[in-house]
UniProtKB/Swiss-Prot annotation:
Keyword Ribonucleoprotein carried by entry: yes
Matching PANTHER family: MITOCHONDRIAL RIBOSOMAL PROTEIN L24
HAMAP family documented for this protein: Ribosomal_uL24_B (MF_01326_B)
Subunit annotation: Part of the 50S ribosomal subunit.
Any one Gene Ontology BP term: translation
Protein name: Large ribosomal subunit protein uL24
UniProt keyword GTP-binding present: no
GO cellular component terms, A-Z: ribonucleoprotein complex; ribosome
């Protein structure tokens, strides 16, 4: 099955503490989760690793969020949108369901 959400897609969070925030997908995990830039920030207590020259402390980083809790953001409508697939010139492409516009 083709991935509806891909890396570098502009998405909007539908539920949770970051509801309504927009960000760019940095990584799509095989477990059905995605990592979005600036969304779902958590504080990790990092141990120092002198061999690598890493300092210890509290580091803020992005945690994975389930793909069902985000939707692709349609710039034309300014809203969250659904994705469909169709064939154009022998290639499978993604499109916005609301206005039929091809994604990228």
């Amino acid at each position: 099955m083709a991935a509806k959400i891909r890396r570098n897609d502009e998405v909007i969070v539908l539920v949770g503490k970051d509801k309504g925030k927009k960000g760019k997908v940095t990584k799509v995990l095989e477990t059905g989760k995605v990592i979005v830039e600036g969304i779902n920030l958590v504080k990790k207590h990092q141990k120092p690793v002198p061999a690598l020259g890493q300092q210890g402390g509290i580091v803020e980083k992005e945690a994975a969020i389930d793909a069902s809790n985000i939707a692709i953001y349609n710039e034309a409508t300014g809203k969250a949108d659904r994705i469909g697939f169709r064939f154009e010139e022998g290639k499978k492409v993604r499109f916005f369901k609301s206005n039929g516009e091809t994604i990228k």
